[in-house]
Design a protein with these regions (language model features):
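Second-shell loop/turn segments in exported
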Residues: 3, 28-32, 130-136, 160-166, ...
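Extracytoplasmic/secreted proteins, especially bacterial periplasmic and envelope-associated proteins
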Residues: 13, 17, 38-42, 54, ...
Length: 252
């Protein structure tokens, strides 16, 4: 199973917890500020080497606006990185040199372990409305490409939105729900399940409602573990010699 998205995807569902509880292998291909065009080419590249049964796409990046010339330049750049991998590695090194990986972060299969707490205290943010937040056309175009790529490779696509008062609202929920309904794609909005999850914004966010911390991620992961077991036939790889690296990392 692969996960696509920006930093919200890196802090919401823990691959190590999924592994320890049910033996599901899951790798997060997200990165801070990731554009959906990058997600598409990252998935396309991953499929050259892997055959995931499920792809999870965290939806925050769908609403990232860029002007048309910037969007075009980004798309051309992402295409070039796919066909010329040396450019991709150069970009990864550039991120490290520019300190885009914060000091003190630990990463396990793409999951960023962050246990700090900075409470969110601005109250309710999911106020019902029939209005929708517009998803930029270029983002819809790449979302369609991801959907079609998954269909072509017989991969089940699952959309989800991490709990985040800073980034999410009901207008965004309506927009994603409309797209998911149009194409029969399952969609989980964790902002609609705060009571069920037991999310406490005094303790479960790292940075005042932008990202979940480790405590919040535990709650999302518990829910997702049950959901995946109920809706997908994903194999339990615990005890398989090919996956000993997962046991090693889980013990750390």
């Amino acid at each position: 199973m692969l996960v696509l998205g920006d930093s919200e995807s890196m802090t919401s569902i823990s691959p190590m917890e999924l592994w320890k509880s049910v033996g599901i292998t899951r790798y997060i291909c997200g990165q801070s500020g990731q554009r959906i065009s990058e997600s598409y080419y990252m998935l396309k590249h991953a499929l050259d080497y892997q055959s995931p049964q499920v792809v999870l796409l965290e939806t925050n990046m769908l609403f990232r606006y860029t002007n048309t010339p910037d969007s075009l330049r980004s798309s051309i750049s992402d295409t070039a990185m796919y066909y010329f991998p040396v450019l991709q590695y150069h970009n990864l090194w550039k991120n490290i040199v520019n300190d885009q990986i914060p000091e003190g972060w630990q990463s396990y299969k793409g999951f960023a372990i962050r246990s700090g707490v900075a409470a969110y205290s601005k109250g309710s943010y999911m106020k019902k409305t029939k209005k929708e937040k517009e998803i930029p056309q270029i983002n819809l175009w790449y979302l369609d490409k991801i959907r079609k790529l998954c269909e072509k490779n017989k991969i089940q696509l699952l959309l989800y939105t991490s709990a985040s008062p800073v980034n999410h609202n009901y207008k965004r929920y309506n927009a994603v729900l409309k797209y998911a309904g149009k194409y029969g794609i399952p969609y989980i909005d964790f902002n609609q399940k705060l009571k069920e999850l037991g999310i406490d914004w005094k303790n479960d966010t790292l940075d005042k409602g932008d990202h979940l911390n480790l405590s919040g991620a535990h709650k999302i992961t518990d829910y997702m573990t049950m959901y995946l077991q109920e809706h997908y036939m994903l194999p339990d790889h615990r005890g398989d010699e090919k996956f000993t690296s997962w046991d090693t990392m889980a013990s750390q």
